[in-house]
């Protein structure tokens, strides 16, 4: 009874009648104005991000990697901080909570999984950038395919994405720490192919 009556009253207020067209146009105009205001805010935030990213030595070189954008670089740098405080990329993996742990008890050897003890936002940034990179970046697609098809210990979907993300951490670390340019061929050569290992 009462709920149905309330629903009918709300439907009547939102229905497009004689005045409905005017209300709909006004609502659409307000939504467009709000959208334009958000675009301007986004441009301002992006400009500040860009200014801050350029202050970090060699950060601009990370943007030469296909699929890595300003937001990814800014997010990575804000979570990791000064790269000089790390002695190896494994420390960044640990910071992200991407080091492997084995779930076992007694004589039983369980599945390995990531610890998730580190920074959740850093893990999220890496995971979000890896999905499109695996699709659109040829060398990272090869890295992913290697992890899923290698003869010894092939990884499944999410595990392979995490392993490729760890590879991206190593690339970021090397570029930021040593100031080298990104080299897709070097990344490809780092993949130990099953055929060459068997030969």
What function would you assign to each model-found segment?
Residues 1-59, 189-191:
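Glycine-rich, often acidic, oxyanion-interacting loops/wings at catalytic, nucleic-acid
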Residues 27-30, 34, 118, 156-160:
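Conserved acidic
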Residues 38, 126, 168:
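A residue-level signal for conserved active-site and pocket-lining positions in enzyme catalytic cores
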Residues 42-45, 81-85, 132-140, 169-184:
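Short helix-capping/linker segments at secondary-structure and domain boundaries
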Residues 61-64, 70-157:
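Phosphate-backbone recognition surface of nucleic-acid-processing proteins
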Residues 107-108, 144-199:
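Low-complexity, acidic/Ser/Thr- and charged residue-rich accessory regions of DNA metabolism proteins
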């Amino acid at each position: 009874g009462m709920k149905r009556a309330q629903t009918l009253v709300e439907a009547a207020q939102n229905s497009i009648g004689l005045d409905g067209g005017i209300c709909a146009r006004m609502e659409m105009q307000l939504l467009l104005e709000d959208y334009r205001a958000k675009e301007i805010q986004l441009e301002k935030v992006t400009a500040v991000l860009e200014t801050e990213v350029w202050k970090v030595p060699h950060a601009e070189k990370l943007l030469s990697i296909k699929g890595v954008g300003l937001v990814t670089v800014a997010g990575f740098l804000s979570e990791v901080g000064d790269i000089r405080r790390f002695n190896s990329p494994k420390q960044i993996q640990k910071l992200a909570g991407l080091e492997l742990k084995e779930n076992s008890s007694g004589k039983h050897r369980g599945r390995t999984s990531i610890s998730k003890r580190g920074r959740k936002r850093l893990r999220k940034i890496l995971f979000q950038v890896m999905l499109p990179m695996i699709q659109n970046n040829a060398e990272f697609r090869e890295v992913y395919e290697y992890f899923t098809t290698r003869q010894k210990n092939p990884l499944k979907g999410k595990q392979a994405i995490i392993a490729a993300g760890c590879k991206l951490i190593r690339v970021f670390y090397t570029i930021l720490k040593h100031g080298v340019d990104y080299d897709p061929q070097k990344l490809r050569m780092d993949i130990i192919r099953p055929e060459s290992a068997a030969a």
